[in-house]
Amino acid sequence: MRAIRTVAVNVFLESVRDRVLYNLVLFAVILIASSYLLGQLTAGQDVKIIKDLGLSAISVFGLFIAIFIGIGLVSKEVERRSIYALLSKPVSRSQFVTGKYIGLVLTLAVNVAVMVAALYLVLGYLSWRETAAFKLSWDAPGPDPRLMKAVFLTFLELMLVTALAVFFSTFSTPMLSAVLTFGLYLAGQFNADLKNFDKVVDSQVAVWLSRAAYHVLPDFSSFDVKTQVVHGLPVSPGYLASTAAYGLAYIVALVLAGTFIFSRRDFK
């Protein structure tokens, strides 16, 4: 565990020094703050627009961080030949990959926390500025604690994207890892549609392939509850628990697969 912790801390410290990371987070915070101005253009819908744009900004910029830092976590060490020095230390390859993943998850957690704080500050200001009579027209309060349900699932989604990026980086180039990770992310957004593919095609082979893809591809759409939260609709604890269990199981499988592949690579 000490070796994993050391690798994770090094990844975290290296990531927070990355200027690209600061630029992404700064741009996300500016976008969240700007949503207040956009909300003023739509009477009665301002709080919904701020919540929707804020949660979307957290998801999109978190995705950029997960992919563009995650794809180079392992391959960068191989390209710089620093992998030899790292593996000569008392660190196994499985500890190396696991530590890299945990380090990036810590980086994501800090940056998501910053963006969430910015969103709640904007919502808090809006709630303070508006009259009590006007706030009665809102479906949910401004700084609504239930927003954290959407943030929780969004963070799990980003953890899964990170696991994909780290998995691909154990055996492919950064460019290919980015393409594969982003491609699977997009495909996973439409995973639920594959379940009913037999209703739109007649080919039995296509139906079998779609069902296989449905069970293999990660269902990223299940992590998206922004619409329900923004409109004050309930998201049950059971749904949160089952989705979290699904995401964590997929993450563990990807990290284990990545460590298995990386442990068998020959760097000579």
Name what the model sees in each region.
Residues I32-L73, V97-F171, F197-K199, S210-Y214, ...:
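Secretory targeting signals
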Residues E14, S75, L86-S88, A165, ...:
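Helix-capping/transition residues at the boundaries of transmembrane alpha-helices
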Residues E77, P90, F171-S172, R264:
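Helix-loop interface residues and adjacent transmembrane-helix termini in multi-pass membrane transporters
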Residues M1-Y22:
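Aromatic- and glycine-rich beta-strand/loop motifs that create alpha-glucan
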Residues I67-L87, V91-R93:
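Transmembrane helix boundary and interhelical loop/hinge segments in multi-pass membrane proteins
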Residues R19-Q40, S56-I67, S177-Q189:
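Hydrophobic alpha-helical transmembrane segments of multi-pass membrane transport/permease proteins
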Residues Y36, T227-K268:
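Alpha-helical transmembrane segments of multi-pass membrane transporters/translocases
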Residues L24-A28, K100-Y101, L108-A109, T181-F182, ...:
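Residue-level recognition of transmembrane alpha-helices
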